[in-house]
Every structure is written in structure tokens, then in C-alpha cells.
């Protein structure tokens, strides 16, 4: 139900073999390490994104090489809406190019339930504006 299955191809005992790496519980955290250009996104991340979309999960994707992963996620979501009971929405927040970004207001009063939420939001904003207070 939750597992992610990564296809593999490896050379062993003088012949090529196909297999699978099964990540049975992706909630326990996953880390993908490798040098630039080693195929981390192609071999692992893309499969995670696609399989989780097919299973109807929501995702928060940090796309360092925007729009690479965003394009894959968006197109796969368009082609596989059957995993969702409610039609999902796709949003992009792009700090490098705000013209390509959706807008949101994290301090809008509708998002605050009590004075503690307002205090914590103001405190976080002030710490980010003046790093000497940290």
C-alpha cells in the first residue's frame, strides 16, 4: 500500500539481471546520496514521486533544479487522477522567480486560531528579518 519499488538492472556472474529495491515503509525517512549527475533523480526521486501520486498521496517537492521535478509531478498528476477522491490542486512557490509562483499569505487571519499563532508568526518573521536576534 505505501511501499515504493525501484527497478534495478545489475551485472552479476557475467550476466545482466533485473530486480527491485523495495522501500517498504517510506515514512521512516529516506535519503538519497550521490555526486552531481549520478542519476539520483532519475533512479530514485522520480519513481518516488510517480508512485506516490498513483497511490493518491499529497506531496511537498523541493525542486532545486526547477522545473525538472515539478514538470514530472504535474504531468504525472494530470495522467493519474484516479488515486484521489477529490481532484487535487497543484501549486508552485518559486522564490527565485516570483512571476512563476502562486501566492500565499501565511499570516492571513483565517490561518490563525488564537493569539499564540499570531505571536509565533510575528516572532518567526522578526527572527528572520534580524539574524542577530537568533
Say what each PLM segment does.
Residues 3-134:
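Switch/coupling segment of Walker-type NTPase motor domains
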Amino acid at each position: 500500500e505505501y511501499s515504493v519499488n525501484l527497478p534495478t538492472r545489475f551485472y552479476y556472474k557475467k550476466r545482466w539481471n533485473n530486480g527491485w529495491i523495495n522501500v517498504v515503509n517510506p515514512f521512516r525517512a529516506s535519503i538519497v546520496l550521490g555526486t552531481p549527475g549520478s542519476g539520483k533523480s532519475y533512479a530514485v526521486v522520480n519513481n518516488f514521486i510517480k508512485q506516490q501520486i498513483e497511490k493518491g498521496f499529497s506531496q511537498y517537492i523541493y525542486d532545486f533544479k526547477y522545473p525538472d521535478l515539478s514538470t514530472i509531478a504535474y504531468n504525472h498528476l494530470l495522467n493519474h487522477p484516479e488515486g484521489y477522491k477529490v481532484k487535487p490542486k497543484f501549486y508552485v512557490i518559486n522564490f527565485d522567480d516570483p512571476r512563476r509562483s502562486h501566492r500565499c499569505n501565511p499570516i492571513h487571519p483565517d490561518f490563525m486560531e488564537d493569539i499564540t499563532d499570531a505571536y509565533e508568526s510575528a516572532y518567526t518573521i522578526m527572527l528572520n528579518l534580524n539574524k542577530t536576534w537568533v
